[in-house]
Regions:
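A short helix->beta-strand "capping" segment at the edge of beta-propeller domains
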Residues: 7-25, 55-61
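Beta-strand-rich domains and repeat architectures in extracellular enzymes and scaffolds
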Residues: 17-49, 64-76
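Surface loop/turn motifs at the tips and blade-to-blade linkers of beta-strand repeat domains
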Residues: 19-24, 63-68, 104-110, 145-152, ...
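Short coil/turn segments that connect the beta-strands within blades of beta-propeller domains
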Residues: 35-36, 79-81, 119-121, 164-165
Length: 196
């Protein structure tokens, strides 16, 4: 019998249309642009924070620093709350978007890498090929999907975004972003960001 050939997944490129100054010492883990405001989650133990940044100048306008034991990771905006993960401490933080005051904490059983939402549930990655869907009020898992391309697992899923009905995940230590079907976990396309 003939061997079935794996179908090539479409790859898109990019065009840089604008550049902005940025704090070179910030180990960026998540970015959110909302109503003219730029929010950033930064990592590294002893240097992790959530900050509001002036897009045009790169100046930090507000900052909320994490305790030194936490390594900040991905972040998403849910209603008027910023939700930030930490890497290995299995602890997440909830902040008031306006004041950056920490208003709640929550826990999860895996590492925390990236987070986004689909307007109904939070979606979290842990560096594996699994995406976890969480209730945004209780932070309890509601389902999970395995991410694959041609039936092969795609792991190292890092920060996430929800774009036009798809989950976009950057792949740690690569220049690629996977476009993922949120129902099946199948990679439907790639963005190749080589050169940025």
């Amino acid at each position: 019998l003939p061997v079935a050939l794996a179908q090539e997944t479409a790859t898109c490129s990019y065009e840089v249309v604008q550049t902005y100054p940025h704090d070179q010492n910030a180990f960026t883990q998540g970015l959110i642009f909302d109503q003219g405001e730029l929010y950033e989650s930064t990592g590294l133990e002893g240097k992790s924070s959530v900050r509001k940044v002036d897009l045009e100048t790169g100046k930090v306008l507000q900052i909320s620093k994490l305790d030194d034991r936490y390594f900040g990771e991905g972040m998403t905006l849910w209603q008027d709350r910023l939700i930030q993960l930490t890497w290995v401490s299995k602890t997440g933080f909830v902040y008031d978007k306006e004041t950056l005051k920490q208003i709640a904490t929550f826990s999860y059983p895996t590492q925390g890498w990236g987070i986004t939402h689909n307007h109904q549930e939070l979606i979290m990655s842990d560096g594996s090929n699994t995406l976890y869907f969480l209730n945004p009020n209780t932070f309890k898992e509601t389902k999970r999907i395995k991410v694959t391309e041609n039936d092969r697992p795609i792991d190292k899923l890092n920060e996430l975004e929800f774009v036009k009905g798809e989950i976009w995940a950057n792949i740690w230590l690569s220049d690629r972003i996977a476009r993922i079907d949120p129902e099946t976990g199948v990679v439907t396309g790639w963005l190749d960001l080589t050169g940025i």
